[in-house]
């Protein structure tokens, strides 16, 4: 055996249970152990580690040669985001569904049955008994979030591999488009079961498009030309990691903060001349959906191909999500700040999503399901949204304020909504636009800052699960309260309490520590992968070995005495 090979062995001390981890002086039971057999170095009893499983299932390798984000791709992203604004599936469709319910219902305790008024309690037949209209709408929302959770667990992580994410977003988008056009057929109150089915399915597809589309923006921002230059400056030591993180974070906020005023203004062209026509609401929904189709199609044309790696062996697109979720829960200690944020956001999303639904139910009753009045309220909200998103972005950019601080400011005012109850609907939409629009932007920016590089779809899927799964709880609790009291306002105290608890938890999230945890997380798993793939050829003496993590990198691409590393 050559002196060089002896030196290699001396740098990789071996004990009966594996090499020593030099940093902790602890024995690593899953490190590789080597012996010489018939002139070759062989590994004894390979260890199957959780970390190796994690690397194999999670790591979606991102090549540094990914295409640079170009202007038409960026603007097609803006246009899709603008079209996928929720006015159709989240506002108009729910209002049409609630209109059908209200028309089919009656005032409880009346005989003969009296039709529901805007201010009276209203019940509909449900499972052999009766249930309030507000309760049924909240049940439908709970079903939406339950189905979304299943989708995110099932397919969320699979979007990291190959071109699956690209095609998944296309399919979900087309489903949502078709069902919104289908809602145009809802003309009579007796059609409320069909309206409920289409509303739930369309809203599930819409919610899923938001999550899988949001997973694109960290990579889109990362490959903006000036962000790429900043990454090169970081490699060359011209800027530090903190400065680079600030540049990338601000670009993420810039891409995510887009309003949706135009779709509501366009709808006025239908709603104003046809405001006394019953079918005007359906036409407005058609116009809203067509607006999304016209703006959204360009993303699927101009999006550049950035395929991920192949699905790991032993997994497929249908199973990898469940495997990853199980392993992610086992690895929770590796990213404590990220998962603390997920817990906080679980509560916050539950409170604010359910608050929004409850306010919409009350608001729809108050305006007698008039799409024109709903549009005026939406214009108020979206105008404030546009002003606030760009205003918040300017303030953050000018004063170099961290995302967490901006997020806490938006949280403070958002929490006031369930505290007050917000019966003044125009003022509610002003507050919502000014503070909840940037809240959503900062919420997804926070998770993008806390997640390890290369695990975008997986962590955005977990983020989506946190957002949607949490909202299974709120609607079910609130619908039970409302059904028992026949008073919509009694749901707000519960919502306020969980929002306050969430805000306190967010305050304890250390973003800098979480970002560093994410780097170590990705580096450790990349090191494991490279260690598994690296090998050593000893051409002179005929040796071949696979080198473990404790090997030295000296001699790479050349070596001494015929030794070459690869």
Give the location of each predicted region:
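A late C-terminal transmembrane helix in Major Facilitator Superfamily
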Residues: 457-483
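Transmembrane alpha-helix termini and helix-breaking/packing motifs in multi-pass membrane transporters
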Residues: 97-99, 156, 266-280, 393-398, ...
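Helix-to-loop junctions at the C-terminal end of transmembrane segments
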Residues: 148-164, 387-404, 482
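Intracellular helix-loop hinge segments at the cytoplasmic ends of transmembrane helices
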Residues: 212-219, 361, 441-450
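Structural signature of the two symmetry-related core transmembrane helices
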Residues: 167-182, 405-419
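Intracellular loop-helix junctions on the cytosolic face of multi-pass helical membrane proteins
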Residues: 2-73, 184, 188-190, 194, ...
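Short amphipathic helix-loop junctions that connect adjacent transmembrane helices
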Residues: 91-134, 357-374
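C-terminal transmembrane helical hairpin of 12-TM major facilitator-type secondary transporters
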Residues: 404-440
């Amino acid at each position: 055996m050559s002196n060089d090979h002896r030196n290699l062995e001396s740098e990789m001390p071996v004990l009966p249970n594996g090499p020593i981890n030099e940093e902790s002086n602890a024995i690593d039971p899953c490190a590789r152990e080597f012996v010489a057999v018939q002139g070759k170095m062989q590994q004894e009893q390979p260890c199957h580690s959780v970390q190796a499983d994690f690397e194999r299932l999670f790591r979606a390798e991102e090549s540094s040669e990914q295409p640079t984000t170009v202007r038409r791709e960026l603007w097609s992203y803006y246009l899709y985001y603008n079209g996928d604004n929720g006015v159709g599936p989240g506002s108009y469709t729910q209002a049409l569904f609630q209109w059908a319910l209200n028309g089919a219902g009656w005032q409880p305790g009346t005989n003969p049955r009296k039709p529901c008024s805007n201010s009276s309690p209203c019940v509909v037949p449900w499972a052999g008994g009766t249930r309030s209209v507000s309760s049924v709408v909240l049940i439908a929302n709970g079903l939406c979030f339950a189905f979304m959770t299943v989708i995110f667990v099932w397919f969320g992580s699979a979007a990291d591999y190959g071109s699956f994410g690209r095609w998944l977003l296309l399919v979900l988008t087309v489903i949502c488009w078709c069902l919104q056009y289908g809602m145009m057929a809802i003309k009579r109150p007796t059609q409320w079961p069909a309206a409920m089915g289409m509303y739930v399915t369309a809203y599930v597809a819409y919610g899923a498009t938001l999550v899988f589309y949001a997973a694109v923006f960290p990579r889109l921002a990362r490959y903006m030309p000036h962000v790429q230059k900043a990454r090169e400056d970081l490699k060359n030591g011209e800027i530090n990691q903190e400065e680079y993180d600030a540049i990338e974070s601000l670009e993420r906020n810039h891409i995510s903060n887009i309003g949706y005023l135009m779709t509501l203004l366009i709808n006025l062209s239908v709603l104003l001349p046809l405001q006394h026509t019953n079918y005007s609401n359906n036409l407005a929904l058609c116009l809203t959906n067509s607006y999304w189709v016209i703006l959204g199609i360009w993303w699927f044309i101009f999006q550049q191909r950035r395929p991920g790696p192949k699905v790991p062996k032993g997994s497929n697109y249908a199973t990898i999500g469940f495997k990853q979720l199980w392993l992610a829960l086992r690895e929770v200690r590796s990213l404590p700040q990220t998962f603390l944020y997920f817990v906080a956001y679980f509560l916050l999303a539950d409170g604010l999503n359910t608050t929004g639904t409850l306010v919409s139910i009350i608001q729809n009753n108050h305006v007698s399901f008039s799409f024109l009045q709903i549009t005026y309220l939406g214009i108020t909200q979206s105008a404030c949204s546009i002003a606030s998103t760009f205003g918040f972005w300017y303030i953050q950019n000018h004063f170099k304020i961290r995302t967490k601080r901006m997020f806490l400011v938006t949280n403070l005012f958002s929490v006031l909504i369930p505290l007050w109850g917000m019966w003044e609907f125009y003022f509610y939409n002003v507050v919502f636009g000014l503070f909840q629009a940037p809240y959503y932007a900062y919420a997804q920016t926070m998770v993008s800052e806390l997640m390890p590089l290369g695990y975008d779809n997986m962590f955005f899927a977990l983020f989506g699960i946190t957002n949607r799964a949490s909202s299974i709880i709120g609607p079910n609790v609130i619908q039970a309260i409302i059904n028992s009291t026949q008073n919509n306002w009694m749901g707000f105290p519960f919502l306020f309490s969980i929002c306050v608890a969430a805000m306190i938890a967010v305050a304890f999230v250390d973003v800098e520590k979480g970002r560093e945890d994410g780097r170590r997380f990705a580096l450790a798993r990349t090191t494991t992968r490279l260690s598994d793939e690296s090998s050593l050829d000893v051409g002179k003496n005929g040796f071949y070995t696979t080198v473990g993590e404790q090997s030295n990198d000296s001699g790479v691409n050349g070596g001494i005495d015929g030794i070459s590393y690869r």
